[in-house]
Curated annotation (Swiss-Prot):
Transmembrane segments: none
Function: Sulfur carrier protein which probably makes part of a sulfur-relay system.
Species this protein is from: Shewanella sp. (strain ANA-3)
GO MF entries: sulfur carrier activity
Entry annotation: catalytic residues: 19
Protein name: Sulfur carrier protein TusA
HAMAP family assigned to the protein according to its UniProt record, in alphabetical order: Thiourid_synth_A
Family: Belongs to the sulfur carrier protein TusA family.
Record GO biological process: tRNA wobble position uridine thiolation
Top-level taxon of origin: Bacteria
C-alpha cells in the first residue's frame, strides 16, 4: 500500500500539529492545487483519523488511501471540484 503514497504530487507534513491545525493546513494546500491532483498528508494527531475523511467527504475530495494502524498516519487525497 505504501506505493500508492509515493504517487502523490504534493506533500504536507502535519507532524506535531494538533486539531484543528492539520485540517486547516490541508484546506489551504488543497486550495492551491488543480482539480485531480493528489496530496499526501503525514500526521500524528489521532483526531486526523476522523477529521481528514470527514473533510474529504464534506468538500467532495476523494480519500484515495489511508494508513492509520500506526503513527505517523498517512492519507492520500485527490482534489475534487
Amino acid at each position: 500500500m505504501n506505493d500508492v503514497f509515493s504517487t502523490a504530487q504534493h506533500k504536507l507534513d502535519a507532524l506535531g500539529l494538533r486539531c484543528p491545525e492539520p485540517v486547516m493546513m490541508v484546506r489551504k494546500t488543497v486550495r492551491q492545487m488543480a482539480q485531480g491532483e493528489t496530496l499526501l498528508i503525514i500526521a500524528d494527531d489521532p483526531a486526523t483519523t476522523r477529521d481528514i475523511p470527514s473533510f474529504c467527504e464534506f468538500m467532495d475530495h476523494t480519500l484515495v488511501a489511508s494508513e492509520t494502524s500506526q503513527t505517523p498516519y498517512q492519507y492520500l487525497i485527490k482534489k475534487g471540484l
